[in-house]
Design a protein with these regions (language model features):
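An acidic/histidine-cluster motif and surrounding catalytic segment
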Residues: 1-110, 119-156
Length: 156
């Protein structure tokens, strides 16, 4: 798995923790081991530009996902497809505000948003209530299991 992290924000982060989380989620979702993913962290003005350009919505957002080869989660007994999973753009300043409101660390919020972004790249969505329930339960399970395996007690 090739996972590139480009930090263009002022936020100091543990890139290895982001990469470990991404690898864990991709592994659990049975993404091909040679799949590529790019994580980019940007400041609020850069995220706002992307949000307006791609979603036609004002202001910065927390996470945006840009799928490339439209890979889907692997199925038992089938070889997963190779390819580029896509790009995930995270905005640490927005994540920090959300983390404060939720009562947990910014780093945990970024891991949550990363997990959310990977699920979007794999075709999950939350436009409908049943889709939202499925996606949010899956992202919570994936993240809490990842954090527990690393000895973290999540405040999520």
């Amino acid at each position: 798995m090739s996972i590139d992290v480009l930090n263009e924000s002022d936020f100091a982060l543990d890139e290895m923790e982001l990469v470990a989380c991404a690898k864990y989620v991709m592994g659990e979702m049975k993404v091909h081991p040679q799949a590529d993913l790019c994580l980019k962290l940007v400041d609020a003005p850069a995220m706002e530009v992307l949000h307006v350009q791609w979603m036609d919505l004002p202001g910065p957002t927390d996470v945006m996902s840009f799928p490339m080869d439209e890979l889907r989660p692997g199925r038992d007994g089938q070889e997963p497809a190779e390819g580029v999973l896509g790009d995930i753009v995270l905005c640490p300043s927005v994540a920090g505000r959300q983390a404060l409101d939720a009562g947990h660390a910014t780093e945990e919020e970024l891991l949550l948003l990363l997990t959310h972004g990977i699920l979007h790249l794999l075709g999950y969505d939350h436009a409908e209530p049943d889709e939202e329930r499925e996606m949010f339960e899956l992202q919570r399970t994936l993240l809490l299991t990842f954090l527990a395996g690393r000895g973290h007690r999540a405040g999520l």
